[in-house]
A protein has these predicted regions:
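ASCE RecA-like P-loop NTPase motor cores
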Residues: 1-428
Length: 428
């Protein structure tokens, strides 16, 4: 529910019950600024739940609105200029002739000093549950604590090592980490050359076995274009955030996860406030620091909340290629262009994509256009230096597209041939 949507619902509710105030702003400004203009105890006594017909037939009505207002009245200030309110609320059942048990929830709301709703939760009544089992789509423990009740004992029954063994051995998924950079592409810095080269090389190796990829939502069209340019007729992509429990790629031979995304500091601050923890971004206390580390007594909680979106988003993306245990003879390999995964999750690590410069492409284009050339001939017939020629050829000589006849040329020089000229190097 957006701030604007909640504002309209609260205004309509206040009008219906003829409250002493009439708007969302009247309420939250009093709480945030502490003006004391409103008697909150009196307002709490005025709160009532309208009859069910009002909820059924009023477009701006919502069954949780009375409880949300009560939670706001209970709000207290927390870290990062957030206010957190909570209440237990029994909401009206709108099903005609309903004769079942009451529906009770714990409502929690987080709003900031600008009067914007940051988080809004309706926690189910778990009192009759003997256990609640959470799947690995949301594995971070602080989020589980925030999304349930403090009275529920929480345990992680599968550790990350066991989880990876299950992915690799039972679901036949191999993960290859490419390079050692995070490649966080939430808003900018999508590495077009590296992604383009990786798509080209994967397509060349796996042919029709490579047709898909996953990246940040902002760059799905870029990834689709790179896949198309690599020869994929109808590329299929997913983006971080819509990949959970989607099995669209479970029959693919090879896949690409390009980069990762990270939550904003404000997003993590919302959860830190909700959990009543003490942590702040390191860059808030050190002007020269540009990373995403957190400091404070509960910095570890903030780091887990960061991992909930960054690391686990990449893991979920990789998992879209995993096979079911009913496919024991089939498997997939996923190339991950980010270093955010725990070391134990990468079955193999290869060097980062190396993008050729103009001189390197000139040298290799010359090799490709001639039927066997020596380094000396390249040096003589291009404007590349002798050292640049030798460095480029030595850099590429172990790749399958470059062939070398050792000592086959004049003065026992090596003779080089090329099947093609890629835009860069990567081991796939």
């Amino acid at each position: 529910m957006t701030t604007d949507g909640l504002r309209k619902k609260i205004k309509r509710y206040f009008t219906e019950i003829d409250a002493q105030i009439q708007t969302w702003e009247d309420l939250v400004v009093n709480i945030v600024q502490g003006t004391g203009d409103i008697d909150l105890d009196q307002l709490r006594e005025e709160l009532e739940v309208p009859d069910t017909d009002w909820f059924r037939y009023n477009r701006e009505a919502h069954a949780l609105t009375p409880g949300i207002v009560e939670a706001i009245i209970h709000a207290e200030e927390r870290n990062h200029d957030r206010w957190v309110g909570e209440t237990r609320y029994t909401f009206p059942t709108l099903i005609p002739n309903y004769d079942g048990p009451e529906h009770e929830v714990i409502l929690r709301i987080v709003f900031d000093s600008e009067y914007h709703v940051r988080l809004l939760q309706a926690i189910p009544d778990f009192t009759e549950a003997r256990s609640v089992i959470g799947l690995d789509a949301h594995p971070t423990m602080p989020k589980w604590k925030a999304n349930t009740l403090s009275s529920i004992e929480k345990n992680q029954i599968i550790n990350s090592d066991d989880n990876h063994k299950w992915r690799r051995n039972q679901r036949n998924l191999t993960i290859v980490q490419v390079g050692d950079n995070k490649n966080t592409w939430t808003k900018k810095d999508f590495s077009d050359p590296k992604v383009r080269i990786l798509c080209d090389e994967l397509r060349h190796k796996y042919e029709n076995g490579f047709r898909t990829g996953i990246t940040a939502k902002r760059f799905t069209k870029d990834l689709q274009q790179h896949l198309t340019n690599a020869g994929v007729d109808s590329p299929d992509t997913l983006y971080f955030g819509n990949e959970k429990s989607v099995e669209d790629f479970d029959s693919e031979q090879a896949g690409l996860v390009a980069g990762c995304i990270s939550p904003s500091s404000d997003h993590i601050k919302d959860w830190i406030a909700l959990l009543d923890k003490d942590a702040k971004p390191k860059r808030d206390v050190e002007d020269s620091y540009q990373g995403q580390k957190w400091v404070g007594e509960d910095a570890d909680v903030a780091e887990e909340l960061l991992a909930d979106i960054r690391e686990n988003g990449v893991l979920q993306a990789c998992g879209r290629y995993a096979r079911s245990p009913q496919q024991p003879d089939d498997g997939a390999i996923v190339y991950v262009l980010t270093n955010v995964l725990p070391d134990e999750y990468a079955d193999k690590q290869v060097d980062d994509v190396s993008v050729f410069g103009k001189k390197e492409m000139q040298i290799l284009d010359y090799v490709l256009s001639h039927d066997g050339v020596t380094p000396n001939r390249i040096d003589q017939e291009t404007d590349a230096s002798r050292k640049h020629v030798h460095d480029t050829l030595n850099k590429c000589r172990d790749y399958s597209w470059l062939h070398v006849d050792e000592n086959a040329g004049e003065y026992n020089a090596d003779v080089f041939y090329a099947d093609r000229r890629p835009d860069g190097l990567v081991e796939v």
